[in-house]
Curated annotation (Swiss-Prot):
Species the sequence originates in: Ganoderma lucidum
Catalyzed reactions per annotation: 2 (2E,6E)-farnesyl diphosphate + NADPH + H(+) = squalene + 2 diphosphate + NADP(+); 2 (2E,6E)-farnesyl diphosphate + NADH + H(+) = squalene + 2 diphosphate + NAD(+)
Primary enzyme class: transferase
Full protein name: Squalene synthase
Keywords: Transferase
GO biological process: ergosterol biosynthetic process; farnesyl diphosphate metabolic process
Keyword Transferase (UniProt): yes
Length: 467
């Protein structure tokens, strides 16, 4: 941010200005891949690897910063892994390539990626990562330098992903269907494009010895991590994707008749463009709420996965995108502006999340706080209200089970201490105390009745006439 932007931020959002200053002053990168001491693991001294790092910056500047802080040679491995998947995704997304051209490339990409000298310059000029494929020789050269254990994982994940992408691309081209039908199809698509990324990364952690070997077998948890990120991006990027006629929201959700009936209509939406048409705002928000509920279903599995990580750099690499996803979900929820503009969390909020996402407890509480914000904005007339409440409650329950919070206390005049009445749990504690007091009172009464009975019996015995 320039000086003018910072001055404007100081005047309009002073708290955010303070957060950014704190981030600038105190958050130091864990490593600098350009330093000579890092060259053996980062490969910065080689022109080919340096170009790969440049491509990473161009494709995802925010993500590249997180990758570069991963310790050892894992940063270089993840960089190449990301570029391979980005190259694959670029071909799959290119609407200018006919299906007969796209299919053989997609289905052979895992072999082409490591083939010396292979490049591809037939992507449309508007594809932002086109140059990556044009200069693919730098990627293939570095891939072939990797240890076999890492390279085999990259090739295996690419082969699985390309199969799913090719199948979906062929279906769209041959059936003229532009929509994903069911939630199951939606989950499968997200598994191919994101869940497999989580699987590959986790296998890297295990293969490197930096995490437990059995972690690589936790496929359900790794899939949840990927699906949570992908589904959040799909919600946020709705309008951008719609303008390019890419529709990832499943018809099973956006076409539900319940959402139409909730606003007095007979049916749900029939076409996705109806979501951003004037007069459909309320029904569109109900659809969006259903999409958010679907994402929140992956939250506790993601928290379970993060609890298994032991290396700080790996934990931060995995945790920061997840907390960003929760922040993005909260920003999108009940925000109709999302259907017309590309929205994103503010820079200061992102900086705060980066600084706070350092351990499982704090990350869990970040999840909980954003879940509370969404639940506070939920409306009872929303057909998904109950399911949303349950999803948010499960996050609360997970946090209390693994990282119990403390009931807040408040000092009153005279030096006394009482439970803070603004803490919702105060009522639970007060009810428990009242129950304990009532049980104690009943016990005392029972003891008094017993003593009284004994005295009465003793008195009657003493007054009885002797025989």
């Amino acid at each position: 941010m320039g000086a003018t932007s910072m001055l404007t931020l100081l005047l309009t959002h002073p708290f955010e200005f303070r957060v950014l200053i704190q981030y600038k002053l105190w958050h130091e990168p864990k490593r600098d891949i350009t330093q000579v001491s890092e060259h053996p693991t980062s490969g910065w001294d080689r022109p080919t690897m340096r170009r790969c790092w440049e491509f990473l910056d161009q494709t995802s500047r925010s993500f590249s910063g997180v990758i570069k802080e991963v310790e050892g040679d894992l940063a270089r491995v993840i960089c190449l892994f990301y570029l391979v998947l980005r190259g694959l995704d670029t071909i799959e997304d290119d609407m200018t390539l006919p299906d007969e051209k796209k299919q053989p490339i997609l289905r052979q990409f895992h072999k082409l990626a490591v083939k010396p000298g292979w490049t591809f310059d037939e992507c449309g000029p508007k594809e932002k990562d086109r140059q990556l494929l044009v200069e693919w020789t730098v990627v293939s050269e570095e891939l072939n330098r990797l240890d076999a254990c890492y390279r085999d994982i990259i090739i295996d994940i690419a082969e699985k992903m390309q199969t799913g992408m090719a199948d979906y691309a062929h279906k769209a081209a041959t059936t003229n269907s532009i929509y994903i039908g069911t939630v199951d199809e939606y989950n499968l698509y997200c598994h191919y494009v994101a869940g497999l990324v989580g699987e590959g990364l986790t296998r890297f952690w295990a293969a490197s010895g930096k995490e437990a070997e059995w972690l690589g077998d936790q496929l359900e948890l790794t899939n949840a991590m990927g699906l949570m990120l992908q589904k959040t991006n799909i919600i946020r990027d709705f309008r951008e994707d719609a303008e390019e006629r890419r529709f990832f929201w499943p018809r099973e959700i956006w076409g539900r008749d319940a959402y139409g009936k909730a606003v007095g209509r007979a049916n749900g939406f029939r076409e996705m463009h109806e979501l951003y048409e004037r007069g459909n705002e309320k029904q569109a928000l109900w659809v969006q709420s259903g999409m958010v509920v679907d994402v929140l279903g992956h939250a506790t599995d993601s928290l379970d996965y993060l609890r298994l990580l032991t290396k700080q750099s790996i934990f931060c690499f995995c945790a920061i995108p997840q907390t960003m996803a929760m922040a993005t979900l909260s920003l999108c929820f009940m925000n109709y502006d999302m259907f017309h503009n590309h929205i994103k969390i503010r820079r200061a909020e992102a900086a705060s999340l980066i600084m706070r996402s350092t351990n499982p407890r704090d990350v869990a509480y970040i999840f909980r706080d954003y879940a509370r914000k969404m639940h506070a904005r939920a409306l009872p007339e929303d057909p998904s209200f109950l399911r949303l409440s349950v999803a948010c409650g499960k996050i609360e329950q997970w946090c209390e089970r693994h990282y119990p919070s403390f009931v807040r206390l408040q000092q009153v005049s005279g030096g006394g201490i009482v439970f803070d009445p603004s803490d919702a749990r105060t009522k639970v504690v007060e009810a428990a105390q009242a129950r304990d007091n009532e049980l104690a009172r009943e016990k005392r009464l029972a003891e008094l009745r017993d003593k009284t009975g004994k005295l009465e019996r003793k008195l009657r015995w003493s007054q009885a006439p002797s025989s």
